[in-house]
Amino acid sequence: HWIGGWIWYYIQKANRENFLYDLYDIDGGNIQYTHYYPGDYYTWHIDGDISTTFKPEIKPGTGENLRDDQTFHKGECVRKLSFSLQLSDAKDYRGGEVEFINSAGERYFAPKQKGTLIVFDSRTKHRVRTVKSGLRKSLVGWVVGPRWR
């Protein structure tokens, strides 16, 4: 789908300008649609750490599902980057902010403007605060790469 290509383009741009991580592709080629109604939230968590390893279900760099053992990527992978694409207009809901906290305890909020793509290190602690009214919609996913060196 075109949206996956668009997201991948900006993930690579963010990676070049901010992280310089070795990346394969979006985890499993999957992007999740999420929605939060009033009262919904997601508590503090991280999406990956140095021990999160698994075999991807996609051919690196293509997004194609792998069917045969000859083309299956044999190495272990880790989630390195996470992303969220804001689908709702900020005026359509209250609350639901994506909040980050760094190791010094400083907190930051992601922009809520519709169309904003947030790309961040998967080891960053974050949450979605409680939606107070309206509906918050987003696309979220994770980017995998080889084990950390």
Regions from the language model: what does each represent?
Residues 1-117, 123-149:
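Fe(II)/2-oxoglutarate oxygenase catalytic core
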